[in-house]
Regions:
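P-loop (Walker A) phosphate-binding loop of NTP-binding proteins
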Residues: 3-5
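ATP-binding Walker
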Residues: 8
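Walker A/P-loop
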Residues: 11
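The feature captures the helix immediately C-terminal to the Walker
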Residues: 14-15
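Post-Walker A helix-loop "phosphate-sensing" segment adjacent to the P-loop in P-loop NTPases
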Residues: 18-27
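ATP-dependent small-molecule kinase phosphotransfer cores
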Residues: 29-90, 97-100
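Conserved phosphate-donor/acceptor-positioning beta-strand/loop module used by diverse small-molecule
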Residues: 90-95, 104-128
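NTP-dependent small-molecule kinase module
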Residues: 124, 128-132, 146-194
């Protein structure tokens, strides 16, 4: 799992990770929010109505789901189960609340936390994105402060102070995890002790 506050650069890191490791399966989240400019159905999210989302949630169709800033987001269970059954590695890009739910349901899931170099830089990124009002940005920054406190819950942290460097570090983490799996548990990934 790749998690971190809104605006930290998760989407950009995921794009670079998938370019470097094209065999990695990306879990596409479902959401009730409207698409942002340059977001495509089925590529960035599955954009669904509230009724359809609620049906999926009630039927156990999500590995996790949450209300975030007045919209619902969820990780559909079936595509992940199918990919894992076929022996493929799955990447889930998610918020902190969702990562906690997934970890509770799937304790073997490996959690990478992406953090900004500072809250000031995070605010700059959110404003540059141009898709939220001032009120929404203030809400996202308040939530980010809470989420940053969750960093010790994650297996490893990557500071996104330079996108290319952060993306390269995440690629290296995935490579090490794959080697650990292949080599029977031997890894040089420095993990936090929980």
């Amino acid at each position: 799992m790749l998690a971190g506050p809104s605006g930290v650069g998760k989407v950009a890191i995921v794009a670079r990770l998938l370019a470097a490791l094209p065999d990695l399966e990306l879990s596409i989240s479902a959401t009730t929010r409207q698409p942002r400019p340059r977001e495509d159905e089925g590529r960035h999210y599955h954009f669904v109505g509230r009724g359809k989302f609620d049906e999926m949630a009630e039927a156990g169709g999500f590995l996790e789901w949450a209300d975030i800033f007045g919209e619902r987001y969820g990780t559909p269970r079936e595509p992940i189960d199918r990919a894992l059954a076929e022996g493929r590695d799955v990447l889930v890009e998610i918020d902190v609340q969702g990562a906690r739910q997934v970890k509770a349901a799937e304790p073997e899931a490996y959690m990478v936390f992406i953090t900004p170099p500072s809250l000031q830089e995070l605010e700059r990124r959110l404003r540059t994105r141009g898709s939220e009002t001032d009120h929404q940005i203030r809400g996202r920054l308040a939530k980010a402060s809470e989420e940053l406190a969750a960093e010790p819950e994650f297996d490893v942290t990557v500071v996104n102070d330079d996108l290319e460097t952060a993306a390269r570090e995440v690629v290296e983490i995935v490579d090490r995890l794959r080697r650990r799996t292949i080599n029977g548990g031997h890894s040089r990934v420095k993990e936090r002790k929980h």
